[in-house]
């Protein structure tokens, strides 16, 4: 699901969302390596904790979703990934890119 999501600058994203309860599925990358994947209703705190253990070259991919929809988003994406030609990952990536552009990323 996250492979087509836009790569965001971690520090800028965190500054933008400081103090918010962001829900979603997210991953941190160090250089080009995925070093952390998580999901839940407190992405900001989780990402702050993991970030402390990483080097300087960190980027973030996130598919945000409201509240209880996180699990549906993950489960739906797994179903789409299992069937070639599934549209949800592409639609999610487009939605994430539009949100990122609206926020100045």
Regions found by a protein language model. Give the residues of each.
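Catalytic or ion-translocation cores adjacent to nucleophile or general acid/base/metal-coordination motifs
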Residues: 63
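Coupling/hinge elements of helicase-like and P-loop NTPase modules
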Residues: 84-94
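GIY-YIG nuclease catalytic motif and its immediate N-terminal context
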Residues: 1-49, 58, 66-79, 98-105
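A surface-exposed, charged beta-strand/loop segment in the N-terminal or early-internal portion
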Residues: 55
